């Protein structure tokens, strides 16, 4: 791909002048500011996505179960639960899973590594959620 538009600061090249213009903001700072919390962003689109945190808007909705999400990537990840096809297979036990994320989480069940320790009694857990559930018992 020919990239005729070059940044004068870092020499990175782009296919269009629009991409170059957007890129240049990383050198000039973050001109877009959230009116609610004051956080700065280098891109207006990123600011708009951030503002949904404050409004509670979740514009990406699953067509199968109608659950809504803040970000499109979370919707795509969620939609994998509706698949019947399970292309990821655990090399230890053969269990079939729908996503690489769930395979990675499943693999922890075969490990002795327990990185989440209770600060009160030092009991350790494989998953952060299990630690939180345990801490409620103190």
From Swiss-Prot:
A zinc finger (C2H2-type) spans 5-27, 32-54, 60-82, 88-110, 116-138. Its main location: nucleus. It comes from the Eukaryota. Gene3D superfamilies: Classic Zinc Finger. The keyword Nucleus applies. One of its GO terms (biological process) is regulation of transcription by RNA polymerase II. Belongs to the krueppel C2H2-type zinc-finger protein family. This is Gastrula zinc finger protein XlCGF44.2. It comes from Xenopus laevis (African clawed frog).
């Amino acid at each position: 791909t020919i990239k005729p538009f070059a940044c004068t600061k870092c020499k990175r090249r782009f296919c269009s002048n629009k991409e170059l213009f957007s890129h240049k903001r990383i050198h000039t700072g973050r001109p877009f500011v959230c009116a609610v919390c004051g956080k700065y962003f280098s891109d207006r689109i990123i600011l708009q996505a951030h503002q949904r945190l404050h409004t509670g808007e979740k514009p990406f909705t699953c067509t199968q179960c109608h659950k809504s999400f803040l970000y499109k990537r979370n919707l795509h990840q969620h939609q994998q639960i509706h698949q019947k096809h399970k292309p990821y297979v655990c090399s230890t036990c053969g269990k079939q899973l729908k996503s690489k994320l769930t395979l990675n989480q499943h693999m922890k069940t075969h490990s002795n590594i327990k990185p989440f320790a209770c600060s009160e009694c030092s009991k350790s857990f494989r998953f952060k959620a299990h630690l939180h559930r345990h801490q409620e018992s103190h």
